[in-house]
Amino acid sequence: MSGFVPTHIFFTRGVGRGETQLVSFEAALRDAGIAPYNLSSISSIFPPHAEMITREEGLKKLSPGQILFTVLARNTSNELNRMVSAAIGYAIPRDRSKWGYLSEHHSFGETEKVAGSFAEKLAAEMLASTIGSSAQLAYDKQKEEYVLEDKILTTGSISSTAVVLESGEWTTVVAAAVLIVE
């Protein structure tokens, strides 16, 4: 049984500003390139054999109104000078017949690097715990990714951060993993 398994995945991010929370969210989705689609929230599994593609390649495979399965991180504020962050982390096993993990992280006061690193670590820890070796998970500073013996192929993240610039203005950030079923 093959089921309904996504074959491609891409990552995107956006920032939006507006007079209302909804308007700023729509602007963030537009900035991320995913506003013309119906977003359906899913949990944190990076499908076996799914190919990671660029945002540009992914958007070419889509049609307006299409239902998109996403792991979406979102944060918003209208507090002047407040920094909002959203990040998606991923961890992919070396054995691509196995599933990996996606994680979402939403925070205040964190830079893109800090938020992204946290989301990446979450995904790596979830993957390591399914392999049964979470105590041996280590960060390789040279490769800038988490490693677990020879079991993790790659880890990474995408993040978006913005500061509320005007009083009364809503600012929203999004980061998303978009999964495509063909």
From Swiss-Prot:
Gene3D superfamilies: 3.30.60.30, Pyruvoyl-Dependent Histidine Decarboxylase, subunit B (3.50.20.10). InterPro entries: Pyr-dep_his/arg-deCO2ase, Pyr-dep_his/arg-deCO2ase_sand, Pyruvoyl-dep_arg_deCO2ase. GO terms for biological process: arginine catabolic process. The modification Pyruvic acid (Ser) is found at S44. Pfam families: PvlArgDC. Its EC number is 4.1.1.19. Keywords: Decarboxylase, Lyase, Pyruvate. Binds 1 pyruvoyl group covalently per subunit. It comes from the Archaea. GO terms for molecular function: arginine decarboxylase activity. Its cofactor is pyruvate. The record marks S43, S44 as: Cleavage (non-hydrolytic). SUPFAM superfamilies: Pyruvoyl-dependent histidine and arginine decarboxylases (SSF56271). It catalyses: L-arginine + H(+) = agmatine + CO2. HAMAP family: PvlArgDC. Belongs to the PdaD family. This is Pyruvoyl-dependent arginine decarboxylase. It comes from Thermoplasma acidophilum (strain ATCC 25905 / DSM 1728 / JCM 9062 / NBRC 15155 / AMRC-C165).
